[in-house]
Amino acid sequence: MRLKCTISYDGHLFNGYQVQPGKRTVQDELEKALAVLHKSKDRIPVVSSGRTDSGVHAAGQVIHFDTPLSIPAERWPYALNALLPDDIAVKQAEIADDGFHARFSAVKKEYRYFVYTEKHPDVFKRHYAYHFSYRLNVQDMREAAKHLIGTHDFTSFCAAKTEVQDKVRTIYELDWTETADGLQMRITGSGFLYNMVRIIAGTLLDAGIGKISPDEVKSMLEAKDREAAGRTAPGHGLYLWNVYYDN
Amino acid sequence: MRLKCTISYDGHLFNGYQVQPGKRTVQDELEKALAVLHKSKDRIPVVSSGRTDSGVHAAGQVIHFDTPLSIPAERWPYALNALLPDDIAVKQAEIADDGFHARFSAVKKEYRYFVYTEKHPDVFKRHYAYHFSYRLNVQDMREAAKHLIGTHDFTSFCAAKTEVQDKVRTIYELDWTETADGLQMRITGSGFLYNMVRIIAGTLLDAGIGKISPDEVKSMLEAKDREAAGRTAPGHGLYLWNVYYDN
C-alpha cells in the first residue's frame, strides 16, 4: 500500500530535508520512525516532493512511502507523531494509488517567505521570519515581481553551485501581501531551482528599499547570470507551503 | 541615572527569569550584557517587575537598573540587543526618576495564556502555545472565570510550595477570546501568586471540557486548598504581557 502524507517541520534544528551522513535531517527522522513502526531493522525509504535547505521550514511538504501495515489512513498521523521528534508533524495521510509519486506527480508548488520590519528584533520570530527593519515600498516590489511571472530561464535566480542544466521554469503567481508586522511573499510555480525563491525574495526586497528599480529585474532575468540578481534572503523566512497534484 | 526597559524573552531555553547558580536565566544574561557594556568586572544589578518560571515567556517584562553611562535612552535597546542572546530583546528604554522601582512601582500586571486546539501538533507552536485538542465550551469557561474576578484569597490557585502568607489578590479582568486556531486567556491583576495564572488556565480549561461545572470554581476558591482547584497548565503557553505603572 502506498501512503501519501502531508507533513510540516520546523527547519531550525535540521540540516535540511535530505539525508546527509552525520547530519540531523528530516528524511532521516522520518525513516527512523517508520522503521520503528514497521519493527524493521532496515530503513523504510521515504520520497518527498523535493528537498528543502538547512533552516527552511515546511508547512505542507508531501511525502510518500510503501507499507504492508494496514493502519487506517486517518490513524497514521497519530502513529507517526508519537514516534517523531516534536519539530516534525504529520498533518494528514491518505492512501494513494501505486502510480502516485510525491515528486514526479507534483504539478505545482507554493512557497511563502515572511519578513518583519519592526525596529527591534522579535524573539518569537527569530527562527521564523526575516528581520528586515527598513521602510519598504511594497508597490515597487509588486512591480518588480511582475517581470518574473511566466516562463523564463531563471539562471540569474539560481545558486551557482547546481548541476541542473535546464533552468527554465514557470512562475504562476508572485505577490506580496502586508501582514500585521511585515510582509509575506507568496509564490507558486512549476518547480523551483536551488535557492531560487530566496534569491527572488532578496532581489525584490532590494527593489523595496530602492537599491534597484523595479524594471532592473527584467534585465537581471535576461542576463542569465547569478551575479546580476540580488542577495539570497536567509532560509529561516522560507516555508514550503503547499504541493499540488492532479487529483 | 535609572533606566526603565521593556523587554521580551522566549522562555523555552531559560530556567526562568531569576538568577540561579549553574542555570541559564534571563537575569543572568541581562547582567552579563550590562557588565560588558559598562566594561565592569562586577555585575550590574537588574531589578524586574517579578519572576517568571522556566519555559514561561515575556512579551512585556519591565526591568530597571542604574547606570553612569550617558547613552541616549532610544539607543539603549540597540546597545543591549547587540550583546544579548537572540532569545532576549530590549524593546524600549526610558529614563526613569530615581524613585521608580520595576517591582514595587507596578500597579497592575497582564498575562496571556495561549491554547491551540487543532487535531495534530503544530511544530511552530510547540514552544509557544498549549496543544489542547478538545472541543471547548468557551461560554462555560467565561462563566467559570467570572467567579475569580475581584478581590479574593487565591490560596486554592497558588502552588503549594510558596513562602507567601497573604494570598489575597485582586483580579481586574479575566476573559477568553477565540483566535484563528484556538483560544487566548487574558488576565490582569494587582499581582499574582506562584503558578496562579497557570492554575487558573488549567482549571478553566477543565470547565471548557465539562470536567467541572462553571459554578464549582466558586467553591474551589472558598476551599482555600490547592487540591480543590484544577491542573497547572504548562508554562510554555504563558506570557507576561504587560506591566502597568502610575505615570
From Swiss-Prot, chains A, B:
GO terms for molecular function: pseudouridine synthase activity; RNA binding; tRNA pseudouridine(38-40) synthase activity. It comes from the Bacteria. The keyword Oxidoreductase does not apply. SUPFAM superfamilies: Pseudouridine synthase. It is an enzyme of class 5 (isomerase). Gene3D superfamilies: Pseudouridine synthase I, catalytic domain, C-terminal subdomain, Pseudouridine synthase I, catalytic domain, N-terminal subdomain. It catalyses: uridine(38/39/40) in tRNA = pseudouridine(38/39/40) in tRNA. InterPro entries: PsdUridine_synth_cat_dom_sf, PsdUridine_synth_TruA, PsdUridine_synth_TruA_a/b_dom, PsdUridine_synth_TruA_C, TruA/RsuA/RluB/E/F_N. Keywords: Isomerase, tRNA processing. The active site is at residue 53. The keyword 4Fe-4S does not apply. Its EC number is 5.4.99.12. Belongs to the tRNA pseudouridine synthase TruA family. NCBIfam families: hisT_truA. HAMAP family: TruA. This is tRNA pseudouridine synthase A. It comes from Bacillus subtilis (strain 168). The gene is truA.
